[in-house]
Amino acid sequence: MLQIGTTFSKTATKILLCGAGELGKEVAIEAQRLGLEVIALDRYENAPAMQVADRSYTLSMLDGEALRHIIEKEKPDYIVPEIEAIATDTLAKLEQEGFNIVPSAKATQLTMNREGIRRLAAEDLGIPTSPYAFADNKEDFTAAVDAIGIPCVVKPIMSSSGKGQSVIKSTADIDSAWHYAQEGGRAGKGKVIIEGFVDFDYEITLLTIRHKNGTSFCAPIGHIQEDGDYRQSWQPHPMSDIAVQSAEKIALKITEALGGWGLFGVELFIKDDQVIFSEVSPRPHDTGLVTLISQDLSEFALHLRAILGLPIPNITQHGPSASSVILPTGHSTETQFSGLEDALKEPDTQIRLFGKPEIAGRRRMGVALARDTSIEKAIEKAKASAMAVKVDF
């Protein structure tokens, strides 16, 4: 039976977030609602989740020694990775020593690295994926592009939010794609994945929750990506019963292999009734921000319930809903937002401003959420709400 102690006492139940961005912030808020003591880590000061945490630390989480020092000092009950760039070998050792890594050190290690998760899905589990190859030098990269064929997609094996990703549309793009991937990779030592182009009708995120009573699925989330990063999402995305069943079967298979309790964002391509696996994140997914308005339990609430071993008897859908990101371009440490009166004038609209302390170039600074009588109306309402928010630098 779960017992939650008193914060700032010897009985406190502590959750430590490795990553303090906007998704971590929502997890921290859900943890606060249940009386947990929240510690947030990130590589920069005043990150969004730090603003609602009880304590925070600034460090590179790729520094295993520094990460271990904080974890041994805090002795958290739950260690929850919220980003990919973490010293996963250190987490694996800490798990062996008795610390609780969410959902598991194995899941964190494999999904941090596109090579690990792709080999697990395609080679170990036999799940349909796009054609792929890996390369860690320019010569092998050029050969892999030739073998996979053009057009193809190039991604660093370790990156997020579209960093380093590009599409090779002709041989003239090969050099620039290689160099762009090298700039965008975090800790992958220059290695990239080359993926064959997939002919698909649409792509979805299937939020999959592994909890003490089994596995639950949220309604499919459709989304639009630009430059490898999410711009809009909506729920539910219409799918045939056959496609939904295939998607859930694949999601169940991959999440069972990763193990542990928590929410997973499983990304899938759909062509007619055929489902092709793309990626999986063992944590809340950015496209799942729409669940803040579309469901009675958001993806963040579901993640926390699963982590704590609490019941998830059902997930109630409120109706057609959408999200649209607020994505300004500028340079400032004193960003100001206006236009909220216009952004929120329609019923069933919400705004989340993430509280990021700095913008340097283009950065996701918030999201508009909307609900309506149809997906199309919800998307338009969310877009209009996001566009109404003005950003001054």
UniProtKB/Swiss-Prot annotation:
Broad EC category: ligase
Binding site for N(1)-(5-phospho-beta-D-ribosyl)glycinamide: 22-23, 82, 286, 356, 363-364
Classification via InterPro entries: ATP-grasp, ATP-grasp_carboxylate-amine, ATP_grasp_subdomain_1, PreATP-grasp_dom_sf, PurT, PurT/PurK_preATP-grasp, PurT_C, Rudment_hybrid_motif
SUPFAM superfamilies: Glutathione synthetase ATP-binding domain-like, PreATP-grasp domain, Rudiment single hybrid motif
The family this protein is said to belong to: Belongs to the PurK/PurT family.
Catalytic activity, as annotated: N(1)-(5-phospho-beta-D-ribosyl)glycinamide + formate + ATP = N(2)-formyl-N(1)-(5-phospho-beta-D-ribosyl)glycinamide + ADP + phosphate + H(+)
Role summary: Involved in the de novo purine biosynthesis. Catalyzes the transfer of formate to 5-phospho-ribosyl-glycinamide (GAR), producing 5-phospho-ribosyl-N-formylglycinamide (FGAR). Formate is provided by PurU via hydrolysis of 10-formyl-tetrahydrofolate.
EC code(s) of this entry: 6.3.1.21
Pfam family, one: ATP-grasp
Example of a GO biological process term: 'de novo' IMP biosynthetic process
Residues in ATP-grasp domain copies: 119-308
Residues binding ATP: 114, 155, 160-165, 195-198, 203
Subunit relationships: Homodimer.
Organism in which the protein naturally occurs: Hydrogenovibrio crunogenus (strain DSM 25203 / XCL-2)
Pathway: Purine metabolism; IMP biosynthesis via de novo pathway; N(2)-formyl-N(1)-(5-phospho-D-ribosyl)glycinamide from N(1)-(5-phospho-D-ribosyl)glycinamide (formate route): step 1/1
Keywords annotated in UniProt: ATP-binding, Ligase, Magnesium, Metal-binding, Nucleotide-binding, Purine biosynthesis
Entry protein name: Formate-dependent phosphoribosylglycinamide formyltransferase
One of the record's GO cellular component terms: cytosol
Residues binding Mg(2+), per UniProt: 267, 279
Encoding gene, per UniProt annotation: purT
GO molecular function, one term: magnesium ion binding
